[in-house]
Regions:
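Catalytic alpha/beta core of large soluble enzyme barrels
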Residues: 18-139, 221
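Residue patterns forming the tRNA-binding/recognition surfaces of aminoacyl-tRNA synthetases
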Residues: 1-17, 36-37, 76, 108-221
Length: 221
């Protein structure tokens, strides 16, 4: 068991209930930092290029680097979901709740990325590569299901503030703020898209094209 917290970041707090793994850059250097604030101290794991900026945002008074690791050395570390007490279920299956490498991690924010394969294309693809199940506590209406516990029945975007407040309440929020960035919107209704993995089926038409053409004359239109 290790003391401390993996400092992750996300622009979509509503996806945190679906967290399945934390992604790091395998070649990046990460530091275990003992950070002090108002007489108390805690150990935080942050990418080395991000340490000063992160601690500034967290309003820490002072810090010391306790140890350094490569991202590869963090792989396999297990962690507890910060909102487990608020949720009826979390991603609780083989491989979930661990650290993995991913190509989409960059040396910005904290260098550790919250990943929810049920709610993001890159996360989904990496989850499939890792053989992880896809955990989706959201229904087709964009509302949290009963598995989301305290947030059940809430439209996901309306839950952002509550999730941030709950993270703060359990002592798991380092900082929060607004951030301008590009995000997909529906071209019809001009609303931001909710990424949601769903069960679907597809037909490879090229495999049956000849049969389709042969049966045109026998079809009623």
């Amino acid at each position: 068991d290790r003391e401390g917290s993996l400092v992750i970041w996300t622009t979509t707090p509503w996806t945190i209930p679906a967290n399945t793994f934390v992604a790091v850059d395998g070649e990046m250097t990460y530091q275990a930092v003992r950070a002090a604030q108002d007489g108390d101290s805690e150990t935080l794991y942050i990418a080395e290029p991000c340490v000063k900026d992160v601690l500034k945002k967290g309003r820490y008074d002072d810090y010391e680097v306790v140890e350094e690791y490569t991202g590869e050395e963090l792989v396999g570390w297990e962690y507890d979901h910060p909102l487990a007490d608020r949720l009826a279920e979390t991603a609780d299956f083989a491989g979930a709740g661990e650290v993995y490498t991913a190509e989409y991690v960059e040396a910005d924010r904290t260098g550790l990325v919250h990943s929810a394969p049920g709610h993001g294309q890159e996360d989904f693809a990496r989850g499939k590569e890792l053989g992880l199940e896809t955990f989706v506590p959201v229904d087709g209406r964009g509302e949290f299901t009963g598995t989301a516990g305290d947030y059940a029945g809430t439209f996901v975007r309306d839950a952002n503030d509550d999730i941030i407040a709950d993270l703060d309440d359990v002592g798991a929020l380092l900082a929060s703020g607004t951030h301008d960035h590009r995000y997909g919107h529906c071209w019809r209704c001009d609303t931001d898209i909710i990424f949601l993995a769903t069960d679907q089926w597809f037909i490879t038409v090229t495999d049956i094209k000849d049969d389709l053409l042969d049966n045109i004359d026998d079809s009623e239109w």
